[in-house]
Amino acid sequence: MKKVSFLLIISLLFLNACATKTKKFNTQKENCKEIYVYFTQSKNCLGLNFQTYYEEKNREYEKQHDVIINAISNKIFSNNITNDQGWKNYENIIKDFRSSKDKTNYLTNVIYRLD
């Protein structure tokens, strides 16, 4: 019984830590959105935010993230999508990134879709 209780507590702490990390990332993303209303001006802010929360995973994620931000910005600059659509696309990409099992492959596929 004690082992089950201990495992339950550890599991809850782990889930809480993951949820807290996601919440902090989303809060920082919203701060970037408030400071830089235009997605195209928020590239450095979003990049630093991503790097802060995913740096322990892989430097390759950071490079791919930068390519994705630039691709979304290019679509906005060329009037293929609006600023609001750019923010929504970014939010969906990050949400799906968090839930994907093969994160590198997911980011690579996103890059190809955005081109």
Model-derived segments and spans:
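Intrinsically disordered, glycine/charged-rich N-terminal periplasmic/extracytoplasmic linker segments
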Residues: 51-115
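Classical Sec-dependent N-terminal signal peptides that target proteins to the secretory pathway
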Residues: 1-22
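Amphipathic alpha-helical repeat scaffolds
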Residues: 33-34, 73
